[in-house]
Amino acid sequence: MARKSLIQREKKRQKLEQKYHLIRRSSKKEISKVPSLSEKWKIHGKLQSSPRNSAPTRLHRRCFSTGRPRANYRDFGLSGHILREMVHACLLPGATRSSW
């Protein structure tokens, strides 16, 4: 199980990303539309002044049950070993057992 502080940090990043999503998207569109380089630098500076954790690349997918950030399956939202345990216990409909 992941530490609670790491899970809370990830939730904080998700909130920041949602808050600054429209601002980041609009400033990126402005950069592509503006012809002069000096104006592009100004808009880029505004984009750089936003918080680092508001960038979507800083987010991780985490397992719903354990909070593990690695080996996640998008279809289920679970990490590999939890997915395997749930499939073997017949808790996931439509998933078949495999020996791996």
From Swiss-Prot:
Question: What is its quaternary makeup?
Answer: Part of the 30S ribosomal subunit.
- Which top-rank group of organisms is this from? Eukaryota
Gene name tied to this protein: rps14
What protein is this chain from? Small ribosomal subunit protein uS14c
The record's GO molecular-function terms, alphabetically, read: rRNA binding; structural constituent of ribosome
Q: Which GO terms describe its biological process?
A: translation
Give the species. Eucalyptus globulus subsp. globulus (Tasmanian blue gum)
Q: List the disulfide bonds.
A: none
User: Which keywords does this Swiss-Prot/TrEMBL entry list?
Assistant: Chloroplast, Plastid, Ribonucleoprotein, Ribosomal protein, RNA-binding, rRNA-binding
Subcellular location field: Plastid, Chloroplast
Cellular component GO terms, alphabetical: chloroplast; small ribosomal subunit
InterPro entries linked to this entry: Ribosomal_uS14 (IPR001209), Ribosomal_uS14_bac/plastid (IPR023036), Ribosomal_uS14_CS (IPR018271)
